[in-house]
Amino acid sequence: MATVREKAVALDLCATYSPSQRPPGPNGSHRPFRATYIWSSIIQVLYTQVEVKKRRHHLKYHHDCFIGSEAVDVVFAHLVQHKYFGDMDIPRSKVVRVCQALMDCKVFEPIVTACMFGREKKRTVFEDSSCSLYRFLNSSNLLGVQVEKSNGRCTPQRPKHSSFQSASLQSPSLEDLWDNLSLTPADPTHINLTSNLPPKVVAEVWQEQTIRRLLQLVDLPLLDSLLEYTPVAPRIPNVKEEDHNLTSNYLDREILKAFSDAQADEWVSAAVDCLDFLPDHMVVDVSRNLPEQQAPDSKWKLLLFDTIGKHYSQNRAPLLRNQLFDIHTGIAELLVNGKTEPALEATQLCLKLLDSPSREEFRRLLYFMALAADPSEFRLNEETDNRMTVKRMFCRAIVNNKSLSKGKCDLLVLFILDHHKDVFKIPGSLHKMVSDKLVAIQQGTDPDRDTGYTFCQRVDKREFDSAAQNNTRTELCALLKTIYENNSLSPKEKKRLLGQFYKSHPETFIQYFGDRVSSVYT
């Protein structure tokens, strides 16, 4: 059987359907066979949607990298949103296998290396993790990864000259790949090919569906906090301020990074990454108080831990904002009742509502906390173990609300710490809900026709009015009974309250007391 690349060459598809080209229009003109088209669209969406930027991991800086879990999220959303496989539920594990196939076919490569017997060896298994980094093999063709000065993020631009040569699909054909994944492409007439919705609309749908899914998982007494939730806009730095920082504080931060590079310790690397979110004066203090190279590890590790802990122990807004306090309480209740799976999904949704800088800050802090809490690492406190020391130091930085008991705060923080590799993933249920809503908007149908889970029954107006009157009458009778049978009220006070009730609701009063009306109220 001919390989996919041979088929593409025979059909002259390399240039036409490379990631640099837009997918074919809804009319399906010049469309390659279905699996090749799906593969091409996956590669294109990876190039254009994953966040590619300089990242630090395993004591080194790596340029033009993206995170493994984010690649899975992007591919997952793309497959579900465009309904390439109809309404079939696609588990996240199969999307991971798709990413594994992309890596095997040299679309991208892992840059994180494992040291074995003094030699560095590339990982061969794709990891759905926020700690695994990858790089496109033809990243040189990703014209100018532009850096947004407002938040330092890098976004890849669509390559102008790129083909399948860098991603030569030489293993089984794409049809065989989908067969092995137990996924069958839908009929081409049902494949959603249009994606012309404005980014603002897509972002609003993501937030709306995230809130809707949270309401399905967590029982909330009030909805105001969710309905009025607006992410905090990232701060736009002043150009003059930025120039000043480059001259006065940039050197101190670079000294710290060079110091951590000289230490073969992931603990130190994670700590220095957290310093990016600390104010300049604290970073300057750390850089100018670094111990000598001959000093024991405990001295400078304790300096880093105390500095980070001091910053997050200050009176500042918690990373899990109090605006979503009811959600945090609901997650804690799920944990108390032993419902860990819905608690994990609710936590993932809650973190999805955070703005990008806050998510990145929380991710770095959580990774550092996980390393520092390891019992095999440097002992932070002689009296308590590392896990409890880390929890006590950073608990208020994550959740800080007086209405939530200390026990539930500790439970929630330790749960997030134990699942730090999973809490930033996007649940598959949310992908499905967003996909259905976007498809409905694109097709011009009512996007709220199918609301998913239903907690009430639709009734007509006559039935609603009747139920309202009956329920009101029942509650009024219960109130009247409470007043009449309350022995703590004086006869004068009781007579006054009964008189007010009779003047406001005479029919209910007469119905309740019947022939005794004259003796009760005269």
UniProtKB/Swiss-Prot annotation:
Residues 46-138 form the DEP domain. It comes from Xenopus laevis (African clawed frog). GO terms for biological process: intracellular signal transduction. Gene3D superfamilies: Winged helix-like DNA-binding domain superfamily/Winged helix DNA-binding domain. Disulfide bonds: none annotated. This is DEP domain-containing protein 7. Belongs to the DEPDC7 family. InterPro entries: DEP_dom, WH-like_DNA-bd_sf, WH_DNA-bd_sf. Pfam families: DEP (PF00610).
